Amino acid sequence: MNDQHNSVRHSEWQTPVDSNNEPLLIHIIDDEESVRHSCNFLISSLGLPAQVWSSALTFLQQVDIYYPAVIVSDLMMPAMSGQALQAHLNQHDSPIALIALTGQGEIDDAVNMLKLGAADYLEKPINSHRLQEALARAQTLTLKRAELYSIKKLYAQLTEKEKQVAHELLEGNLNKNIAHHLDISVRTVEVHRSQVMKKMQAQHVSELIQKLVMLDS
């Protein structure tokens, strides 16, 4: 790849981390060994951890797709294409962000990948600074998706009545107004409200509102 020996400005790069303060892992998926090697070299130059895979199927068999990460994947691969991989991630509501690698004449396919939800695409040979930009975008995206996925799991624990109370709080209604709207006692509202805060892991109403807004966005 033409730019694999270009210098990378580390001073401009801040390594994103997950909720455990660990650097996000970059998964490189390509059936060509030379591409995997070159891409791994560029990503390692940024100080990021990377893991290489020769096929998307092997990746899916061995990786937890519900953990935030970034994939840099070729579009045209045997057994499972990059598009099929993106569709699989979508189907399973995975937070992982995918960057598609494209060759000449595959721009239409790359655009379709963006429509499917890919974070970005890169043309081969990969430019190191273009890769850095794409990784930054993908890392931000996977962390946002992971946060939303976590909130969805918390919200799914609420009962129907608790969801009603939660959305009344989102509207800014007081307990007595919520009681009137839902035809329940103020005391019952207080009990539901307490459960909502606990299940949604919110310390304050403002934190709860922020999480509910993310669900509605």
Summary of predicted features, one role per range:
Residues 76-77:
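Receiver (REC) domain active-site loop signature in two-component systems and cognate sites
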Residues 106, 126-135, 181:
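C-terminal output helix
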Residues 194-217:
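Basic, Lys/Arg-enriched C-terminal extension of HTH/homeodomain DNA-binding domains
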Residues 57-61, 83-95, 112:
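Short amphipathic alpha-helix used as the core "switch/output" element in two-component signaling
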Residues 1-27, 216-217:
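Non-catalytic signal-transmission and effector/linker regions of two-component phosphorelay proteins
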Residues 52-70:
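Acidic, metal-coordinating helix/loop segments flanking the phosphotransfer/catalytic sites
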Residues 54-55, 80-85, 102:
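Acidic catalytic/metal-coordinating carboxylates
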